[in-house]
Amino acid sequence: MRRPTRLLAFVLACASTAIVARAQSSTTPPKPGPEVRKLAVMVGKFTNEGEVKAGAMGPNSPAMKVNGTDECRWTAGGFGLTCTYAYDVGGTKWAGTGLFYYDSTSKKYRYHGVNNLGEIEDQTGTVSGDTWTWTGESSISGKVFHILYVTKVVSKDSYEYTESWGESENSMEPFMGGKDTRVAISKPATSKPAQ
């Protein structure tokens, strides 16, 4: 009768050791990979200047200037970006928050956002060279629109964008376009000691 008890005690001791060893090895958090680090192009504060195309907000709607700011910061240990924006679009204030991250399972980038107009966006992105392409859906007041959003990095501090919308993927038309420019971070003035 002692043999099964000893064997059971031995098996439990080995299992406990394996569990403890595994727990100790997993205390070092993983580091973001190169795909995640590509999101760094969006980190910082940017000014946005653009235009909503004539007719984009309904028949005979005029073109409207877009001005505002975007700001993105690393979150979740550097695995994603939390971004906020505040725009004036033809006198209407748009403000929202979004989350960008890399999904290693699908090998695509993801974006989820919400704004003060009740719009909810869900997009999937890819990057090729300096061009990011985002496709997905946006729902406003229960109506779903398809979106194509393309950004082209033109320098380390700016990118140009175009956005198209439609009720189906085949009916998308240009909605807006413009340019984001990184705001230079001012360095604090340094004073020299009195002589």
Give short role names for the model-derived ranges.
Residues 1-9:
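Bacterial N-terminal signal peptides that target proteins for export
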Residues 9-18:
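Bacterial N-terminal signal peptides
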Residues 19-23:
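Sec/Tat signal peptide C-region and signal peptidase I cleavage site
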Residues 24-195:
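Hydrophobic small-molecule pocket/channel-lining residues, especially in calycin-type beta-barrels
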